[in-house]
Protein backbone atom coordinates (compact mmCIF):
# COMPACT_ATOMS: atom_id res chain seq x y z
CA UNK A 1 0.00 0.00 0.00
CA UNK A 2 2.79 2.43 0.88
CA UNK A 3 4.48 1.68 -2.43
CA UNK A 4 1.39 2.71 -4.37
CA UNK A 5 1.09 5.94 -2.40
CA UNK A 6 4.74 6.80 -2.97
CA UNK A 7 4.45 5.98 -6.68
CA UNK A 8 1.32 8.12 -7.04
CA UNK A 9 2.87 11.02 -5.13
CA UNK A 10 5.99 10.77 -7.29
CA UNK A 11 3.91 10.86 -10.48
CA UNK A 12 2.00 13.90 -9.23
CA UNK A 13 5.26 15.58 -8.22
CA UNK A 14 6.75 14.86 -11.64
CA UNK A 15 3.72 16.41 -13.30
CA UNK A 16 4.00 19.52 -11.18
CA UNK A 17 7.72 19.75 -11.94
CA UNK A 18 7.09 19.53 -15.68
CA UNK A 19 4.46 22.26 -15.35
CA UNK A 20 7.31 24.72 -14.76
CA UNK A 21 7.84 24.52 -18.52
CA UNK A 22 4.53 26.32 -19.02
CA UNK A 23 5.78 29.40 -17.21
CA UNK A 24 9.06 29.32 -19.08
CA UNK A 25 7.27 29.06 -22.43
CA UNK A 26 4.96 31.97 -21.68
CA UNK A 27 7.88 34.08 -20.47
CA UNK A 28 9.96 33.32 -23.54
CA UNK A 29 7.06 34.17 -25.83
CA UNK A 30 6.50 37.52 -24.17
CA UNK A 31 10.24 38.28 -24.23
CA UNK A 32 10.52 37.43 -27.94
CA UNK A 33 7.50 39.59 -28.75
CA UNK A 34 8.93 42.55 -26.87
CA UNK A 35 12.34 42.05 -28.49
CA UNK A 36 10.79 42.02 -31.96
CA UNK A 37 8.88 45.18 -31.08
CA UNK A 38 12.07 46.83 -29.80
CA UNK A 39 14.00 45.92 -32.96
CA UNK A 40 11.15 47.35 -35.00
CA UNK A 41 11.36 50.61 -33.07
CA UNK A 42 15.18 50.85 -33.02
CA UNK A 43 16.78 48.72 -35.76
CA UNK A 44 20.25 50.10 -35.00
CA UNK A 45 20.18 48.47 -31.53
CA UNK A 46 19.49 44.99 -32.92
CA UNK A 47 22.74 43.46 -31.60
CA UNK A 48 22.22 44.69 -28.04
CA UNK A 49 18.57 43.64 -28.02
CA UNK A 50 19.38 40.19 -29.39
CA UNK A 51 22.14 39.51 -26.86
CA UNK A 52 19.94 40.64 -23.97
CA UNK A 53 17.07 38.51 -25.29
CA UNK A 54 19.24 35.40 -25.56
CA UNK A 55 20.53 35.85 -22.01
CA UNK A 56 17.01 36.28 -20.66
CA UNK A 57 15.67 33.29 -22.58
CA UNK A 58 18.53 31.12 -21.32
CA UNK A 59 17.73 32.06 -17.73
CA UNK A 60 14.02 31.41 -18.25
CA UNK A 61 14.72 28.05 -19.89
CA UNK A 62 16.80 26.88 -16.93
CA UNK A 63 13.69 26.57 -14.74
CA UNK A 64 12.06 24.32 -17.34
CA UNK A 65 15.19 22.18 -17.58
CA UNK A 66 15.35 21.84 -13.79
CA UNK A 67 11.71 20.76 -13.76
CA UNK A 68 12.40 18.16 -16.44
CA UNK A 69 15.40 16.79 -14.53
CA UNK A 70 13.38 16.56 -11.30
CA UNK A 71 10.56 14.74 -13.06
CA UNK A 72 12.95 12.24 -14.68
CA UNK A 73 14.54 11.55 -11.30
CA UNK A 74 11.15 11.05 -9.65
CA UNK A 75 9.89 8.73 -12.37
CA UNK A 76 12.92 6.58 -13.12
CA UNK A 77 15.36 6.80 -10.19
CA UNK A 78 12.89 7.36 -7.39
CA UNK A 79 14.86 8.03 -4.20
CA UNK A 80 11.80 7.50 -1.99
CA UNK A 81 11.50 3.77 -2.71
CA UNK A 82 14.71 2.97 -0.83
CA UNK A 83 13.02 3.99 2.42
CA UNK A 84 10.32 1.38 1.78
CA UNK A 85 12.88 -1.38 1.34
CA UNK A 86 12.56 -1.66 -2.43
Curated annotation (Swiss-Prot):
Q: Determine if Cell membrane is one of this entry's keywords.
A: yes
Q: Fetch the Gene3D superfamilies from UniProt.
A: lithium bound rotor ring of v- atpase
- Could you list this entry's UniProt keywords, alphabetically sorted: ATP synthesis, Cell membrane, CF(0), Hydrogen ion transport, Ion transport, Lipid-binding, Membrane, Transmembrane, Transmembrane helix, Transport
Record-annotated site: Reversibly protonated during proton transport: 61
Record has Cell cycle as a keyword: no
Q: Where in the cell is it found?
A: Cell membrane
Stated family = Belongs to the ATPase C chain family.
Free-text function comment from the UniProt entry: F(1)F(0) ATP synthase produces ATP from ADP in the presence of a proton or sodium gradient. F-type ATPases consist of two structural domains, F(1) containing the extramembraneous catalytic core and F(0) containing the membrane proton channel, linked together by a central stalk and a peripheral stalk. During catalysis, ATP synthesis in the catalytic domain of F(1) is coupled via a rotary mechanism of the central stalk subunits to proton translocation. Key component of the F(0) channel; it plays a direct role in translocation across the membrane. A homomeric c-ring of between 10-14 subunits forms the central stalk rotor element with the F(1) delta and epsilon subunits.
Q: What is the lineage of its organism?
A: Bacteria, Bacillati, Bacillota, Clostridia, Peptostreptococcales
SUBUNIT field = F-type ATPases have 2 components, F(1) - the catalytic core - and F(0) - the membrane proton channel. F(1) has five subunits: alpha(3), beta(3), gamma(1), delta(1), epsilon(1). F(0) has three main subunits: a(1), b(2) and c(10-14). The alpha and beta chains form an alternating ring which encloses part of the gamma chain. F(1) is attached to F(0) by a central stalk formed by the gamma and epsilon chains, while a peripheral stalk is formed by the delta and b chains.
* An example Gene Ontology molecular-function term: lipid binding
GO cellular component: a single term: proton-transporting ATP synthase complex
Native source organism of the sequence: Clostridioides difficile (strain 630)
Chief location category: membrane
Q: What is this protein called?
A: ATP synthase subunit c
* Membrane topology recorded in Swiss-Prot or TrEMBL: Multi-pass membrane protein
Which branch of life, at top level?
A: Bacteria
Q: Membrane spanning segments where?
A: 4-24, 57-77
Check the record and name the InterPro entries matching this protein: ATP_synth_csu_bac/chlpt, ATP_synth_F0_csu, ATPase_proteolipid_c-like_dom, F/V-ATP_Csub_sf
Amino acid sequence: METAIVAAASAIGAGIAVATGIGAGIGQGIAAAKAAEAVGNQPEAKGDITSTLLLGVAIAESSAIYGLVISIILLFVNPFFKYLGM
